[in-house]
Amino acid sequence: MKNPIKWAIIAVLLSTVVAKKIVGEGMADVSAIKHPEEVHPTNRDFLRSLIFSISMIFGCEIGDKTFIVAALLAFENSRLTVFAGSYSALFIMTLLGVLLGHAAPLLFPRKLTDILGGVLFVIFGIKMLMEAKEVMDSKESMSDEFQNVRNEIAANGPIDQLLEEGAAPSHYTGHRSRSGHTLMSQLKSKGRNVMATLFSPLFIKAFALTFVSEWGDRSQIATIAMAASDNVYGVFMGANVGHACCTALAVISGKYISTKIKVHKVMFIGGILFIAFGLVYFYQGFF
């Protein structure tokens, strides 16, 4: 889905929530008091929601731009710092998506949110299948995707210079106080080094690149749809577990995976998963 359409979907959802707050308490709130189980589908199977969201994230993120960004940044830099920066951005995006999806049943009937979720998943699934066919016909490999993302990053400045900025500030490295032999001073020194590493320019760069890449992405919109129709706690936990696994996979073995994975196969599997999820939500909405 093109970026303007993605932004439009998110804008509509956000504006609806804001309008709800401005107008005040409406019929949806009355319904929530009388029939709370029909508004927030938290009584739905937690395990199913967990599995659905993990599968959705894997289908979206393996080989996606955020995956490639993490892999590229981790090639010659601290994997821990890259993981922390990338995952922090994904965690925040997941939280925003889940909160927005959780608000949807207060604005629309539950069956309608199920049907709308089904429509989104089917559309995304069909689009992924079409993209998979295009990639297969063009014989584009994962290595080509890596190069494309590398070029995008390099467009903002030389890639080597951008990555070198992630070095921890020198004044933190090797710092020891006069009482450095005491346990407390050693703990303080290690704490400063850890903070300098985690919140270094590399951390900020990984966070920013991931946040920008993920905003309005297919996985974020899918998370909103799932949170609106399924157990919100299961979706939140599953999405974060999926993001953690995919990001860890990217920073640990992204370069190796790029030579083994076929882009069109990943997109094909993701498309099938999305269509299957859509059918499940259609069933919930109509029956």
From Swiss-Prot:
InterPro entries: GDT1-like, GDT1-like_CS. The keyword DNA damage does not apply. PROSITE patterns: UPF0016. GO terms for biological process: calcium ion transmembrane transport; Golgi calcium ion homeostasis; Golgi calcium ion transport; manganese ion transmembrane transport; proton transmembrane transport. It is found in: Membrane. One of its GO terms (molecular function) is manganese ion transmembrane transporter activity. Coiled coil: none annotated. The chain crosses the membrane at residues 7-27, 50-70, 89-109, 112-132, 194-214, 232-252, 267-287. Keywords: Membrane, Transmembrane, Transmembrane helix. It is a multi-pass membrane protein. GO terms for cellular component: endoplasmic reticulum; Golgi apparatus; membrane. Pfam families: GDT1 (PF01169). Belongs to the GDT1 family. This is GDT1-like protein C17G8.08c.
